[in-house]
């Protein structure tokens, strides 16, 4: 097993309770028509322990963003501009990766899934707002899930739960919808209490 091939992983696996080791692996198999099927494998999974899902949060934020657009009757290709209300936030009105040169929720979601783009995730997170995000997750049965910060740096602490003013425009740059900055109505503490488990990470070069 891979956990016994590298000495550092072998050490962690030997004392998995101390290191709070948990692994979730999803195998994707495609049939002759390219249709995927998924099979999950877990190792030492414990719902009472904290599990940091990292970029996996890009999936629920993308789904909820599309759902919110549908509620607002806004097309996913509408031009999406981001303003700022404090120094750590970013103003965005251009996107050189899109065909028309403008950002949109659709383009941000494409970038999240194609290259796991953290900046794109930050803009979608800001559109949703922390309260909307957690209220909807709770309604869907994910009461213990916490998504409370951007991944592109800059904002810290409470600033991470203050989300930018955003606006949508049609192709003629006519305003469709405007959303003011949003402030979290409460502090979203983790239901498992203290969840700090380390201060570093390893990658393929380690």
Language-model segments: residues:
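Beta-lactamase-like hydrolase cores
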Residues: 1-49
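Active-site-adjacent helix/loop patches that line small-molecule binding or acyl-intermediate pockets
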Residues: 2-6, 18, 99-205
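Soluble periplasmic/extracytoplasmic beta-strand elements of cell-envelope proteins
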Residues: 22-26, 60, 81
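Short active-site-adjacent helix-start/loop capping segments
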Residues: 32-34, 64, 88-91
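Aromatic-acidic/polar surface patches that form glycan- and anion
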Residues: 50-55, 126, 206
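Active-site SXXK
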Residues: 51-80
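Generic short alpha-helical segment signal, independent of protein family or function
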Residues: 66-74, 85, 113, 129
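Short, glycine/proline-biased beta-turn/loop segments that scaffold the active-site neighborhood
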Residues: 71-101
């Amino acid at each position: 097993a891979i956990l016994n091939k590298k000495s550092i992983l072998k050490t962690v696996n030997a004392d998995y309770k101390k290191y709070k080791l948990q692994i979730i692996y999803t195998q994707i198999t495609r049939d002759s028509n390219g249709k995927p099927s998924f099979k999950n494998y877990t190792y030492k999974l414990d719902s009472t322990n904290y599990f940091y899902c990292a970029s996996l949060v890009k999936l629920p934020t993308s789904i909820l963003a599309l759902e919110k657009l549908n509620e607002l009757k806004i097309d996913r290709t509408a031009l999406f501009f981001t303003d700022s209300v404090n120094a750590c936030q970013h103003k965005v009105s251009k996107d050189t990766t899109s065909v028309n040169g403008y950002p949109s929720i659709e383009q941000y979601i494409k970038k999240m899934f194609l290259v796991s783009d953290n900046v794109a995730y930050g803009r979608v997170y800001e559109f949703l707002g922390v309260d909307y995000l957690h209220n909807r997750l709770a309604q869907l049965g994910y009461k213990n899930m916490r998504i409370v910060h951007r991944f592109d740096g800059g904002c810290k602490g409470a600033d991470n739960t203050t989300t930018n003013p955003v606006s949508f425009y049609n192709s003629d740059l006519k305003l469709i919808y405007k959303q003011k900055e949003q402030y979290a109505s409460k502090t979203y503490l983790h239901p498992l209490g203290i969840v700090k488990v380390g201060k570093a990470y390893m990658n393929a070069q380690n």
